[in-house]
Amino acid sequence: TEYADLAETGDWQQHFIEADVVVMLQAQIGGNNYQEFVRNNIDSTRNILNTVKDQNIPNLVHISSSVVESVSNDYYTNTKKEQEDMVLKSGISAPILRPTLMFGWFDRKHLGWLSRFMKKVPVFPIPGDGKYMRQPLYSADFCDIIISCIENNIQSGRYNISGHENIDYIDMIREIKKAINSKTLIVRIPYQLFYFLLWIWAFFDKNPPFTTQQLKALTASDEFEVIDWPNIFDVEYTSFSEAIDTTFNDPVYSKVILDF
């Protein structure tokens, strides 16, 4: 493992020498600083693509995001759209995978953070009525798709990798509560109040786990294309309930918590 800032050229590029494949996963997901999104989603991508070309690496797998087809207008969505466009214009053959909201082991954000927050508070707030449809994707299934792209030498195509079960946000929270045996009370609060509380939080936390932009994205009512990716990539689909149970109750890996 080497820690490096991919937005800057450096010693990390030596690891590309004689590489057979590059899986491009890096991304700035949350935060309130636009320049962090530019550096980690745009500048880093430019450096990686240039290095792939310089080393004549034959295979690239690009991890994009379902948000490139979202109605949202925020830092993450806009820079991920630009990132995907950079890959398409690079001339490098690569399958482009667009996962929806992911969850699984070692999740320091998203459902992982929500589960830990739920364990700490007596009341868990839900914005509005909580009926915001999600299409959560189990990260282990997505890993199998990436492996399939590498092993089967998939060279091109844009694939919308959506979870196959539509589930409202509030029901997703209830499933997490059930999986971790939480006693917290789930309470709906007005959207504007929830937004205001996040806005206040951002004044005291430079890297908040959930931002007002992410709240807008949550309530954007996006519904992404569902393709038959289990057959396309010859992988198995894990049901949401089974995946949630494995995520939070595995005797070994569910206890591993990464620093936020």
PLM regions with names:
Residues 149-210, 224-226, 232-260:
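Mid/C-terminal beta-alpha module of Rossmann-like enzyme folds, strongest
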Residues 4-47, 51-57, 66-70:
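NAD(P)H-binding glycine-rich loop region in Rossmannoid oxidoreductase-like domains
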Residues 26, 61-65, 98-100, 162:
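Active-site beta-alpha turn of Rossmann-fold NAD(P)-dependent dehydrogenases/reductases
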Residues 31, 66-78, 102-108:
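Conserved catalytic-site region of short-chain dehydrogenase/reductase
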Residues 116-137, 145-153, 160-162:
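A conserved pocket-lining segment of Rossmann-fold NAD(P)-dependent short-chain dehydrogenase/reductase
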Residues 42-48, 79-87:
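Conserved catalytic Lys-bearing alpha helix of Rossmann-like short-chain dehydrogenase/reductases
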Residues 85-105, 115:
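Conserved beta-loop-beta element that borders a ligand/cofactor-binding pocket
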Residues 96, 105, 130, 135-143, ...:
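Conserved loop-to-helix N-cap of the C-terminal "lid" that shapes the substrate pocket in Rossmann-like
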